[in-house]
Amino acid sequence: MAKATEKRVKRAKKEESGSESEDNDAIAQEILDTTKSDNEEEEPKKSSKNYTSVEVDESEEQTKTFKDLGVIDSICETCEELKFTKPTPIQAQSIPYALEGRDIIGLAQTGSGKTAAFAIPVLQSLYENPQPLYCVVLAPTRELAYQISETFEALGSAMGLRTAVVVGGMNMMTQAVALSKKPHVIVATPGRLVDHLENTKGFSLRTLKFLVMDEADRLLDMEFGPSLDKILKVIPRQRNTYLFSATMTSKVEKLQRASLVDPVRVAVSTKYQTADNLLQYMVFCPFKHKDTHLVYLVSENAGNSMIIFARTKSDTQRISLLLRNLGYGAIPLHGDLSQTARLGALNKFKSGSRNILIATDVASRGLDIPAVDLVINYDIPSDSKSYIHRVGRTARAGRAGKSVALVSQYDLELYLRIEGALGKKLDSYPLESEAVMLFSERVAEASRAAIQEMKGEDGTKKRSKFDKKRRRDEMDIGEQ
Amino acid sequence: MARSHKVTKPKRQQVDTSGSYNALMVLMGDNVKKAEKRVEEEEPVEQELEEDDIEGAGEEEEEVDEEQEEEEDADDAEEDAEDDSETDKYDPYKLHFEAEEAKYVSVIKSEEWKTSSEKTKIGSQPVRITYTNLEDADELLDFSEAQKTEFSKYTVRPRIKDGFKQLNGSLTSVQKAIYPSLMAYRDLCYATSSLSDTEEFSRLVAMHIAQHVVRTAEEVAYNTRILKRNAEEGIHDVEFRDQGYTKPRVLVLVPTKNACFEFMQLLVGASGVDREDNKARFNKAFHEAGAVLDTKPEDFQKAFKGNTDDMFCLGVKLRNKSIRYYSYFYQADIVFASPLGLKTLVGSEGDSKREFDFLSSIEIAYLHETNHMEMQSWDNVLTVLGQTNLLPNESHGCDFSRVKSFYLDGLAKHFRQTIVACQFVTPTINSVFSNTVNFAGKTKITPIYNGELAVAGMKIRQIFTRFKALSVSDEIDARFKAFVQITLEGMIRSGDYSGTLIYVPTYVELVRLRNYMDEKNISFGAISEYSSITEVKRHRTLFRDGREKILLYTGRLHHYRRYFVKGVKSVVIYKLPENPAFYRELLLFLTHSVDEGTLEQSMAKCRALFTIYDLLALERIVGTKRVKTMAKSGESSYEFY
């Protein structure tokens, strides 16, 4: 399947504008499109583009080095130190244009190396013309913002780069102090950045040279539109803008028209289901034995790192307690946790001190978790996009990976929808139901204990606190 | 008395911030109701605080044309800038507050404190001066140069120079010894029992504070003017780092309203202002005529003169030509407060309403009449000092582009100058003073004591018994044990112990002794600062008449009342008083009995327990010379006549 698609470079001059001939949210369509382009079909979607366009397949071998792309030596060295040996396709395609000073639209998923794709040109430009408050990166979630700033700091360590992260949920004053220390790069969620622009006296983006909007589709999904407008109004028109998005919706296109000048479009068609390295399975089981099946799967894959996705926060909490009661190192990640707790949970998982992460969709996107061997869908997500993103946590960077979906009688309809979107039937996970049922008694007991524990810590007071917090995580979850 | 309209201003700001919060919520397509609820929740708390009666706390700023004032300041600054450029002035402010970042960071990081001390004389008073310096701090501000430079060469605003001259005349010997340390922004601890020396010291401090406040305010106003001009011309790349997070730069802790009033007079005099806003109101609230009984000791008369209210906070705005009392805290330059008053605002961990952001940018902290504040409650002082130079919780309209970088880096406490004026140095003062981290270093000036042994004017047996204490924490139990074994048991066994006055420093020790003596069926009377006046009267009478053989008497009661206890035949000191005057007065109780003929001179005796941890107090009582031979560990007794 991984036949190298030939690179199609199409340069179309700016001719007509106002082409809104795009279906708004045909997600399945979107995915089918991308799969089609893998199969070397004709030019998909967007019939009229008023920009230079480059498309490339992710699996394509890169022969160029960073140096070939025109990256200066000091950054090349840092890349080597960071083990970025070869540019990924998106980097290879976008960096040369970016270094020419063009605006970029990047269509790519997380994990494709796009953070470095925009960080390197920004840093190179900054290197040549050092100046504080040089670049603003807008990201939809706090976690992503921290990851981006880490990448910037790693790449810019040699040049003494200062970054500041400005996200919701953290102390305004500390952030105001960080901003007034004149960082070179600000990584922010739009809402909080507007807050600072309006309320932090003495802070302005008058000197800004670069604006990066990462995961623009999610930024817009989460109603950050008005904030983005405000930001676009106060920053200088003379600047470079990079816009990255997983999908090209009409909203994103509108944003692009409002903020980019003569951009280059770089699209990397990610293969969601690479048959060679991602094995997708399903397990059909009665609802009441779901826990038992889950524990069976966990025990069978014990020692591997895995993410279990559940739909609700209380499910994540319950499952992690359940697994802990059975002696597995499980850690929940969901929106009720404070920011520090979330980062802590993530770090524990990353460092390997816990190898089972139980997450809501908060974690399904934007997080860069290096190696997950198994993804278990405890619930079937309500839309196929989420499913794609969930299983996208494994089988990354050429490694093998497995995903298992637990399908109960109630999930059948959703599951069929996803199968439809994927265009194929999933194999059923090989298991012996007798062996599974051996677990049932212990699981039932652990489950009771878990529920007991949850009730214990869930007083009325806490409930009300949860309610308050909910609102804020919804922006992380980005539910429709 | 004026009720305090507590934080009406912040309330407005809160509504503001929640307003923008609302806006954000709307932007996010969210429910706004919740934000409104937040505001509602906060209001009752404020009402509660409105009832609190801290004189002068958080007054609302009256209508003031801020801009016009700033303009005036800027004009003054321009004039002064011309004046300054004429002569080559020595300006320690620049060396301290505008030091190069790389340099001060390395000095602060070194953390190598070196101490040296010298014996010298100030006027006729022999003193010991102790300097503590960070290594390499000389590179930033060479202190020997500060000492060499004449006072007239220091940069002082002309108006303040004139004002100070009128108030003070030429420098006295005390002031000459102190100005280099003070004006070079070193931490300074000055102990003297002389009232006139204290006064001279205060005057110089007032001048220093006025100079600091006026020059910084003018600098800010001047820079604002430049920024405004630049903005009109479209220049944006000039920036000034000339302020802290919040306006107040100076914190003055004073024990009573009268002390506040008196120091304010010095400040007004030294700053040479023409106009005093809210003067009548200030005078009414803080000034009260009426002296203390002149039979009481001099230092007592000074400490308890006038209005002794110890619950107030006052914001003061000081400019080149005017001073305004009752300025809103976040617009004030100087915060005057009693430890109790400020502590009430600052609150403690877990309080629903705390307010200490205005202490974030304190550059000079002055502790006035510190020994008196110690007697009030030292905890409050510690709490307040602990909340200074922290990152504020809210911005309070701070312009972050103008905040000095050492504030942003959280190094503010390394720049703060702490000035302590006291009658005598106690371990608690020492611990505060030695824990300050001002990189400019510190100077401590303490007198060399002759001791109080011979002041009774009569031969009285004075026995000092040293007991062994392994550590500071062990000292409390060891002292009790030693007291019971060495003093109390022998006394009871001898049977003849009528007229014994047992001096204990505080109520805590009193309770312990009382419980013990109750247990042992020893009859006694006990009076402390918590006793009612009738109770005190009764016990004093019973003791005078010999109907009560033992009287327990606390040092704090003595501090607040300075009773003359009659009928004393023997004094037993549980723990030496920090204030040497107390010891003198205890001896006077004995001489009085001798004079009255109720006590034979040869029988009069004063016994005291001490340990190596009491050396500061002991030094003041037996004198600096003798204390050296007594400063050993182990047990021993010393007798003096």
Curated annotation (Swiss-Prot), chain A:
A motif (Q motif) lies at residues 64-92. Residues 462-471 have a biased composition (Basic residues). One of its GO terms (biological process) is rRNA processing. The keyword Hydrolase applies. The keyword ATP-binding applies. GO terms for cellular component: nucleus. A motif (DEAD box) lies at residues 214-217. InterPro entries: DDX47/Rrp3_DEADc, DEAD/DEAH_box_helicase_dom, DEAD_box_RNA_helicase, Helicase_ATP-bd, Helicase_C-like, P-loop_NTPase, RNA-helicase_DEAD-box_CS, RNA_helicase_DEAD_Q_motif. ATP binds at residues 108-115. It catalyses: ATP + H2O = ADP + phosphate + H(+). Residues 1-63, 450-480 are annotated as: Disordered. It is found in: Nucleus. Residues 277-437 form the Helicase C-terminal domain. CDD domains: DEADc_DDX47, SF2_C_DEAD. SMART domains: DEXDc, HELICc. GO terms for molecular function: ATP binding; ATP hydrolysis activity; RNA binding; RNA helicase activity. Keywords: ATP-binding, Helicase, Hydrolase, Nucleotide-binding, Nucleus, Ribosome biogenesis, RNA-binding, rRNA processing. Residues 1-17, 33-46 have a biased composition (Basic and acidic residues). Its EC number is 3.6.4.13. The Q motif is unique to and characteristic of the DEAD box family of RNA helicases and controls ATP binding and hydrolysis. Interacts with the SSU processome. This is ATP-dependent rRNA helicase RRP3. It comes from Yarrowia lipolytica (strain CLIB 122 / E 150). The gene is RRP3.
UniProtKB/Swiss-Prot annotation, chain B:
It comes from the Eukaryota. Residues 1-12 have a biased composition (Basic residues). Residues 41-86 have a biased composition (Acidic residues). Keywords: Nucleus, Ribonucleoprotein, Ribosome biogenesis, rRNA processing. Residues 1-22, 34-93 are annotated as: Disordered. The keyword rRNA processing applies. GO terms for cellular component: nucleolus; small-subunit processome. Pfam families: Utp25_C (PF06862), UTP25_NTPase-like (PF22916). GO terms for biological process: maturation of SSU-rRNA from tricistronic rRNA transcript (SSU-rRNA, 5.8S rRNA, LSU-rRNA). It is found in: Nucleus, Nucleolus. GO terms for molecular function: rRNA binding; U3 snoRNA binding. Belongs to the UTP25 family. DEAD-box RNA helicase-like protein required for pre-18S rRNA processing, specifically at sites A0, A1, and A2. Component of the ribosomal small subunit (SSU) processome composed of at least 40 protein subunits and snoRNA U3. This is U3 small nucleolar RNA-associated protein 25. It comes from Yarrowia lipolytica (strain CLIB 122 / E 150). The gene is UTP25.
